[in-house]
Amino acid sequence: MNTTEKKELMGKYAKKLENTIKREAAVMKEIENDKALIKYLEGQKTSGAAFDNTVYESYDAWIETIRKQIKKSESTLTNIEFKKVELEAIQKYIA
């Protein structure tokens, strides 16, 4: 594989990285929404509101699931930051 072919291949990979990086705002919004939902559910639980949900067995179970989703999203943000650095390196290589 010659240098031109390598640069073409890395250019294609750079496009994939760019698409992944574009998700950053959506992931951040998802975290924000999840945190707001936790606050709401904790308020409902504290106020003694009846639990009416067929998916989760309790407010605590629902809140715990959302906390896990937040951790996953935070991990995704960390990966996106790494991909930004990786993309920058690739762009310098193919320039």
Model-derived segments and spans:
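N-terminal cationic leader/targeting segments used for protein routing and processing
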Residues: 3, 7-8, 16-17, 46, ...
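Extended alpha-helical coiled-coil "stalk/arm" regions
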Residues: 24-63
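N-terminal compositionally biased, intrinsically disordered segments and leader/signal-like regions
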Residues: 4, 21, 47, 55, ...
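Generic detector of low-complexity/intrinsically disordered segments
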Residues: 11, 19, 39, 43, ...
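Short, flexible coil/linker elements and helix-boundary hinge sites characteristic
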Residues: 13-14, 32, 45-48, 74-75, ...
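Short, charge/polar-rich alpha-helical segments
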Residues: 1-36
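Amphipathic alpha-helical coiled-coil segments
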Residues: 23-28, 61-94
